[in-house]
């Protein structure tokens, strides 16, 4: 059993903005490792904030944002080389602290968050570099909770493949990611998202009450759809949901300000625009933290979401879900999250008020069967996830 791991996800609250999903995956990792007496050191965009939030030591990322591919490739080479020759880096280079942190731990975990696709190539370089540092220092690497691609160009595959092939374990969330991992030369474990059970066994959790409300969590990532068109279509879909279910509508931003009194930012901006176009009344719940977000999703009667982690939280509880997608990436993620629990209610954002309405009616009609399917799958999914965390802790 390992004693202390360094973990990189995509954490760190910057400018007062919380990203529920990314923080949730790290929080779940911290909880699972703590139950196995394994400590963590976090790699974060905001080390002081993350250290305070999670009660673990934190260091800053190596740093690849804004670099050209040539510059990123050279920086990766220099940093990995510096794992054995520290003098290769400037004295104030943040990579020095990362190298020291890896040297002071028993292994590295590449956690969920910062999905590995060419649209975010800085994440690819960051994680491949961390794996390279671990290899140079003789530390094992485990990869968990990943979505791969679907856009992963040959150059990024060449960066990522050696890191994946050197890892002792690789875990992904969707069958499409599993297939892409195989193309990279790795047989990956396919399982539920790492945050699927976040906080669901906390002592203050009470699931005895009836589920209430139409929960709406949208994303400002609209693909090729123009904003006014998206707002109009979403408003019609949500109005239909309110009329169909007879439930109150609640909006909850998964990317929004930590301060509940702050002006709307992130997803909350889109939420306000949609609310203005709706006929049904609605309320807003502040972004809050991952555990509160998970409880909210699990207690809802229906979820309409353009975000991924609301579905991750709600599906295990058997909440009927309408997942809205804007491209292949979001479609793969939504279908992947739902498939683990026997759901498939996904529609394109551009057809939210047509195909989305049909999906809404179907999942609401089938809500009893959806709940039963989740309940039937829970024991196996939970046991498999627990066994996976055991393997991660062993390295």
PLM-predicted stretches and their roles:
Residues 1-395:
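Active-site anion-handling motifs in enzyme catalytic cores
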């Amino acid at each position: 059993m390992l004693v202390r791991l360094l973990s990189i996800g995509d954490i760190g609250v910057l400018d007062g903005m919380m990203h529920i999903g990314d923080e949730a995956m790290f929080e779940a990792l911290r909880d699972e490792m703590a139950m196995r007496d394994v400590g963590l050191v976090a790699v974060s965009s905001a080390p002081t904030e993350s250290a305070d939030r999670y009660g673990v030591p934190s260091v800053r990322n190596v740093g690849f944002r804004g670099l050209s591919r040539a510059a990123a490739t050279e920086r990766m080479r220099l940093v990995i080389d510096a794992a054995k020759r520290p003098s290769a880096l400037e004295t104030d280079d943040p990579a020095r602290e990362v190298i020291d942190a890896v040297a002071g731990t028993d292994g590295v975990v590449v956690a969920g968050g910062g999905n590995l696709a060419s649209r975010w190539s800085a994440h690819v370089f960051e994680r491949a570099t961390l794996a390279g540092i671990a290899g140079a220092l003789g530390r094992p690497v485990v990869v968990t909770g990943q979505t791969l691609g679907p856009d992963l160009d040959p150059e990024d595959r060449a960066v990522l493949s050696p890191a994946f092939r050197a890892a002792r374990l690789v875990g992904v969330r969707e069958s499409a990611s599993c297939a892409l991992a195989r193309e990279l030369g790795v047989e990956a474990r396919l399982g539920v998202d790492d945050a699927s059970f976040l906080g669901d066994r906390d002592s203050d959790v009470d699931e005895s009450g009836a589920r209430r409300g139409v929960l709406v969590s949208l994303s400002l990532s609209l693909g090729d759809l123009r904003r006014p068109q998206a707002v109009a279509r979403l408003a019609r879909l949500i109005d239909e949901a309110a009329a169909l279910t007879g439930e109150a509508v609640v909006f909850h931003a998964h990317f929004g300000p930590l301060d509940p009194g702050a002006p709307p930012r992130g997803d909350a901006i889109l939420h306000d625009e949609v609310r203005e176009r709706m006929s049904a009344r609605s309320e807003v719940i502040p972004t809050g933290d991952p555990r509160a977000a998970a409880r909210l999703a699990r207690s809802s009667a229906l979820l309409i979401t353009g975000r991924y982690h609301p579905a991750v939280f709600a599906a295990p509880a058997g909440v009927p879900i309408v997942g809205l997608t804007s491209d292949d990436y979001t479609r793969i993620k939504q279908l992947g999250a739902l498939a683990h629990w026997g759901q498939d209610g996904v529609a394109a954002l551009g057809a939210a008020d047509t195909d989305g309405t049909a999906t809404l009616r179907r999942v609401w009609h089938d809500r009893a069967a959806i709940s039963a399917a989740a309940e039937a799958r829970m024991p196996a999914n939970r046991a498999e996830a627990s066994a996976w965390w055991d393997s991660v802790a062993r390295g």
